Amino acid sequence: MEAVPEKKKKVATVPGTLKKKVPAGPKTLKKKVPAVPETLKKKRRNFAELKVKRLRKKFALKTLRKARRKLIYEKAKHYHKEYRQMYRTEIRMARMARKAGNFYVPAEPKLAFVIRIRGINGVSPKVRKVLQLLRLRQIFNGTFVKLNKASINMLRIVEPYIAWGYPNLKSVNELIYKRGYGKINKKRIALTDNSLIARSLGKFGIICMEDLIHEIYTVGKRFKEANNFLWPFKLSSPRGGMKKKTTHFVEGGDAGNREDQINRLIRRMN
């Protein structure tokens, strides 16, 4: 037999009485977790700002480099014109003097290039000191010297130990471009970039290699700073060797003043 389900008993309510409502507990609001965390948003924002700053800086540097390249080109062009004008003036003056039946005497040279050709074993302290002042501490070291009364007297003191003369534009150009090293933070640094020169000599208006060559060759107002910036040139032993180091050049040796013939020696040693 099937079981008969029991019927629920109805509870009779007395009229006038109300059912008591059970108070509901406090509602808990669920926090929505953002799809992207705030820290990640902040990182992205900072990265975007940094990227914009980098791009602006890169663009500014590119513009500056472009302007500097243009300035260097204009300077090189101007210097080339100036050198040609100097050369043509010399030729014209010599022709005019020859035409008038006179002799043209060129201006006294302002620049000398000095090369040490001998050691200093057994020499006097005075000679040793002068060689140190000329920054000729090793054999076949070379430096540019501004010619005046004091420097000529110094060269006479150490004349048996040096070969010197008056370099032309080609020699100055080749020496600085091929053997040029700068003194940067008391270190010998190869001049491979104009920015190295601009960093050290920019305050004197020398920002590129052409400025440096022009200042040295013309013995300008900032010759001292430009020459001190250049590390003494380390030249090679001359091709074909030396004739006689202990004898003066006018007697068939190598020492002393050889005037314009120093350019031939520079070609052999550079």
UniProtKB/Swiss-Prot annotation:
Protein keywords: Acetylation, Cytoplasm, Phosphoprotein, Repeat, Ribonucleoprotein, Ribosomal protein, RNA-binding
The keyword Chaperone is assigned to this record: no
Cellular component terms per the entry's GO annotation: cytoplasm; cytosol; cytosolic large ribosomal subunit; postsynapse; presynapse; ribonucleoprotein complex; ribosome; synapse
Region (6 X 12 AA tandem repeats): 7-76
Record PTM N-acetylmethionine, positions in chain: 1
Example of a GO MF term: identical protein binding
GO BP terms in the entry: cytoplasmic translation; maturation of LSU-rRNA from tricistronic rRNA transcript (SSU-rRNA, 5.8S rRNA, LSU-rRNA); translation; translation at postsynapse; translation at presynapse
Positions bearing Phosphothreonine: 39
Modified residues (Phosphotyrosine): 161
Modified residues (N6-acetyllysine): 146
Functional note: Component of the large ribosomal subunit. The ribosome is a large ribonucleoprotein complex responsible for the synthesis of proteins in the cell. Binds to G-rich structures in 28S rRNA and in mRNAs. Plays a regulatory role in the translation apparatus; inhibits cell-free translation of mRNAs.
Family of this protein: Belongs to the universal ribosomal protein uL30 family.
The protein's name: Large ribosomal subunit protein uL30
Organism name: Mus musculus (Mouse)
